[in-house]
Amino acid sequence: MENFPTEYFLNTSVRLLEYIRYRDSNYTREERIENLHYAYNKAAHHFAQPRQQQLLKVDPKRLQASLQTIVGMVVYSWAKVSKECMADLSIHYTYTLVLDDSSDDPYPAMLNYFGDLQAGREQAHPWWALVNEHFPNVLRHFGPFCSLNLIRSTMDFFEGCWIEQYNFGGFPGSDDYPQFLRRMNGLGHCVGASLWPKDLFDERKHFLEITSAVAQMENWMVWVNDLMSFYKEFDDERDQISLVKNFVTCHEITLDEALEKLTQETLHSSKQMVAVFSNKDPQVMDTIECFMHGYVTWHLCDARYRLHEIYEKVKDQDTEDAKKFCKFFEQAANVGAVAPSEWAYPPVAQLANVRAKGDVKEAQKPFLSSIELVE
């Protein structure tokens, strides 16, 4: 395995953060913790239900880590929506992360997918059965156009995860393949459409802005994720089908060239995002800016992306990019570094055990020791 290109990564990250003029002022610390705990608590009770425990069959520690990661993403990025909407989106996106981390072959359970869908029967695939049951809780927050985007994008995501089961990065010369797969599994339209709940936006009045935001968010959101997750995915056997590495294979270019290609496209997308919406409805622009800055904070602060390792590695270096990266990292940590023990309680496993014993009230008591396992 080749060495991680630390200096190159620092340079690309700094260029992105400077380009979007990163500054996260979405919450006070108290507001952030309050929203985190509200969304987490509702989602944790959802996944502690016997049906979810039986059908998902996810290792408790991994489910706990996935839930904490997604609650952070939603609360930090969807800063303008209601706490109830945050909680329902947290559940939905936790399901997607569980699927993304799965290695199960979906083929047998998908043989009669459309027949079951048409007849109104429960899906044979347990993930679809659970997601479909929860979907009404998500869609109640949105108008029909945004809802259609959420449904369609979730279906695309499932197909993208199916493709990734084959660990196929594309054939050399297949230039369209990397972006095809990334759009499929990126949830860009789902994310773009879920920024506009009907209690805040009339989708008929803002139809053009919403449509444009979905189009722009499809690329910006997934490309930023690819840049910020490049470090964690670099030497992980499960993450070798990344956009950057697929660029290397299909475009037959070097890793540095692939990373630069992604960087340039991300910067261009950021420029478009600001230029397109800067003179539109102020509420629309505010929502987009809050998402962009919160989304970056989440990546810098969440343990899943391990960017604290980069920070520790370069904090004593005297290069310009190292100093700028560390300044941005510290800026994000000042607002977004909140220990899970402050909000992610009780653990899902504890709730599930208490439910099995029939004492739900006992599950409301904080039980922090097991949380430390996934901090």
Curated annotation (Swiss-Prot):
Q: Name one GO biological process term.
A: sesquiterpenoid biosynthetic process
Record-linked Pfam families? TRI5 (PF06330)
InterPro entries attached here? Isoprenoid_synthase_dom_sf, TRI5_ascomyc, Trichodiene_synth
**Single GO MF annotation:** trichodiene synthase activity
Which sequence ranges form a coiled-coil region, renumbered to this chain?
none
Q: Which UniProt keywords apply?
A: Lyase
Q: What highest taxon heads this organism's lineage? A: Eukaryota
Pathway stated in the Swiss-Prot or TrEMBL entry:
Sesquiterpene biosynthesis; trichothecene biosynthesis
Q: What is its EC number?
A: 4.2.3.6
Reactions listed under catalytic activity: (2E,6E)-farnesyl diphosphate = trichodiene + diphosphate
* Family annotation (Gene3D superfamilies): Farnesyl Diphosphate Synthase
**Key word Lyase present in the record?**
yes
Q: Which family does it belong to?
A: Belongs to the trichodiene synthase family.
> Other remarks on record?
Trichothecenes are sesquiterpenoid toxins that act by inhibiting protein biosynthesis.
Q: What does this protein do?
A: TS is a member of the terpene cyclase group of enzymes. It catalyzes the isomerization and cyclization of farnesyl pyro-phosphate to form trichodiene, the first cyclic intermediate in the biosynthetic pathway for trichothecenes. It serves to branch trichothecene biosynthesis from the isoprenoid pathway.
Q: Specify the protein name.
A: Trichodiene synthase
- Which species? Fusarium pseudograminearum
What is the organism lineage in this UniProt record? Eukaryota, Fungi, Dikarya, Ascomycota, Pezizomycotina
